[in-house]
């Protein structure tokens, strides 16, 4: 019996590879964070369904969480999230609750008022 990956799993693995191979110095890497967050589109746009651990949205947040292992990377991720909040301002609350719904600790609070320069 031959096993095959679904297109969603293949895309997730490609995104995982993209973010894991990214460098902090490259501002274009925020696009990888945005791509991962795109799996949370319905929640960000409409406020439902709530993401739950094991969903594609929470899987994406887990990948992002693995990338917050230093102060420099947390500041970088914070700035990426602030950029997303600026673009999707009307949905800032949804974006700010993603890590909590998914049980992912990023080391900072996703909030429009967060000053990323003070993240440790």
Swiss-Prot record:
| Short name of one Pfam family | LTP_2
One MF term in GO for this entry? lipid binding
- What are the record keywords, sorted? Disulfide bond, Lipid-binding, Signal, Transport
Record-annotated disulphide pairs = 30-80, 40-57, 58-102, 78-116
Concerning InterPro entries, the annotation shows: Bifun_inhib/LTP/seed_sf, Bifunc_inhib/LTP/seed_store, Plant_nsLTP
Alphabetical GO biological process terms: lipid transport
Q: Which Gene3D superfamilies match?
A: Plant lipid-transfer and hydrophobic proteins
Where does the record locate the signal sequence feature?
1-22
Write out the similarity annotation: Belongs to the plant LTP family.
- Function per UniProt: Plant non-specific lipid-transfer proteins transfer phospholipids as well as galactolipids across membranes. May play a role in wax or cutin deposition in the cell walls of expanding epidermal cells and certain secretory tissues.
Q: What is this protein called?
A: Putative non-specific lipid-transfer protein 14
**UniProt organism field:** Arabidopsis thaliana (Mouse-ear cress)
What lineage is this protein's organism placed in? Answer: Eukaryota, Viridiplantae, Streptophyta, Embryophyta, Tracheophyta
């Amino acid at each position: 019996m031959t096993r095959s990956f679904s297109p969603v799993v293949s895309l997730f693995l490609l995104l995982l590879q993209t973010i894991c191979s990214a460098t902090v110095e490259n501002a274009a890497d925020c696009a990888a964070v945005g791509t991962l967050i795109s799996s949370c589109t319905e929640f960000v746009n409409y406020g439902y369904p709530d993401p739950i651990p094991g969903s594609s949205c929470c899987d994406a947040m887990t990948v992002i969480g693995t990338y917050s292992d230093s102060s420099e990377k947390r500041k970088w991720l914070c700035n990426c999230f602030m950029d997303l909040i600026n673009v999707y301002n009307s949905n800032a609350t949804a974006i700010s609750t993603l890590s909590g719904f998914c049980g992912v600790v990023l080391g900072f609070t996703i909030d429009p008022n967060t000053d990323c320069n003070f993240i440790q």
